[in-house]
């Protein structure tokens, strides 16, 4: 479809619901469409790496100048995740997206033909968005970890063939999020709806525990800064819940490439050489803080944290004396960008970000 639709040029945006899918699809398209520009864009880059990719995406698919908007862009495909829908001012001639809850889906569609004065290929002058509906929902459970089954079901049910934006937005969003009439539901629908209600109730309970209290002097004295974060948490269980996010926790760590004899390089700055037996300068610390990345939640949290803590403590004790670096975790890759961690093979590249595969 891409070869046909973008045969005369243009930019396609493909948005999927997981980073792993985005990476796999980008790999596939690079092989299937030689000579095309395929750019993966997702959250699993280092802070600096993501900023570089974002800059490239905006330069190629952003608003640009009035002169650039009169030129047809040539066979560019951006394969991304939710990061595309959130804030980027990008403009796609064609969009392909996996199903997501209606409000988020409409945000994605808002990146289609976003700039009205842009010249587009003849066959892409009308905005078209292809929404991919999961085939075997019981087999593919990856989306359930991201979005509610009920919201996905409701969105698929109420998704029309054509949409007028922004006129249709309130009606469509309300159709998905309104209270359901359970008397008309099948058992499977009721199960999805009740699970959704329980999830929402759980979020509300966590939010109540973590509500900021007024900045009373006694609270500051008793609990310090943490006291401001956890207002009425009286038990250790409540304190734990107050720090739990709505998604599974992931580990943030600094990525380095290991050289020889205790020398290391930041993955995004190969010109900087760091020695583990030397104190870090302020500039070096600032660089390292830009090399932070969140590990996939599929990696066992406790096992990975324990392994990284041990590695960091043993290999970088002098660095940890720096107050800014204290409690930071460091993941060391080999010169090819590979590492093993908690039963997973990891590989980092500036093009695809951090990829993971479970060791069988």
Predicted regions and their residues:
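C-terminal helicase lobe and adjacent C-terminal extensions/tails of nucleic-acid helicase motors
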Residues: 1-15, 20-59, 65-67, 71, ...
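Short amphipathic alpha-helical segments, especially helix-boundary/capping motifs
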Residues: 30-33, 82-86
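Conserved two-lobed SF2 helicase motor
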Residues: 69-85
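Flexible glycine/serine/alanine-rich "lid" or loop that lines and gates the nucleotide-sugar donor pocket
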Residues: 89
């Amino acid at each position: 479809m891409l070869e046909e639709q973008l045969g005369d040029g243009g930019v396609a945006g493909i948005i999927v619901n997981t980073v792993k899918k985005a990476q796999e699809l980008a790999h596939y398209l690079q092989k299937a469409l030689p000579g095309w520009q395929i750019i993966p864009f997702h959250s699993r880059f280092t802070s600096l790496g993501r900023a570089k990719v974002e800059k490239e995406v905006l330069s190629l698919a952003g608003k640009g100048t009035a002169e650039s908007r009169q030129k047809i862009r040539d066979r560019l495909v951006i394969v991304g995740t939710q990061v595309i829908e959130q804030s980027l001012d990008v403009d796609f001639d064609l969009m392909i997206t996996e199903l997501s809850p209606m409000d988020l889906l409409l945000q994605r569609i808002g990146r289609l033909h976003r700039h009205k004065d842009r010249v587009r290929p003849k066959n892409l002058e009308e905005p078209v968005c292809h929404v991919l509906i999961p085939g075997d929902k019981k087999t593919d459970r990856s989306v359930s970890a991201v979005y509610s089954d009920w919201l996905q079901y409701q969105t698929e049910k109420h998704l029309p063939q054509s949409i007028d934006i922004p006129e249709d937005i309130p009606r469509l969003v309300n159709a998905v999020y309104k209270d359901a009439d359970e008397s008309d539901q099948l058992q499977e629908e009721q199960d999805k709806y009740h699970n959704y209600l329980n999830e929402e109730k759980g979020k509300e309970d966590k939010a109540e525990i973590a509500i900021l209290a007024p900045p009373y002097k006694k609270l500051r004295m008793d609990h310090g800064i943490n006291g401001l974060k956890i207002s009425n948490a009286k038990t250790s269980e409540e304190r734990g819940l107050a720090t739990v996010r709505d998604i599974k926790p992931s580990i943030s760590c600094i990525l380095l490439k290991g050289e020889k004899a205790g020398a290391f390089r930041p993955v995004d700055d190969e010109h900087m050489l760091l020695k583990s037996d030397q104190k870090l300068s302020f500039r070096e610390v600032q660089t390292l803080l830009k090399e932070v990345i969140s590990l996939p939640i599929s990696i066992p949290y406790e096992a990975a944290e324990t392994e990284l803590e041990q590695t960091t403590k043993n290999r970088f004790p002098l660095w940890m004396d720096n107050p800014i670096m204290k409690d930071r975790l460091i993941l060391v890759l080999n010169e090819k960008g590979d590492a093993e961690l908690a039963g997973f093979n990891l590989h980092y590249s500036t093009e695809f970000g951090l990829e993971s595969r479970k060791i069988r």
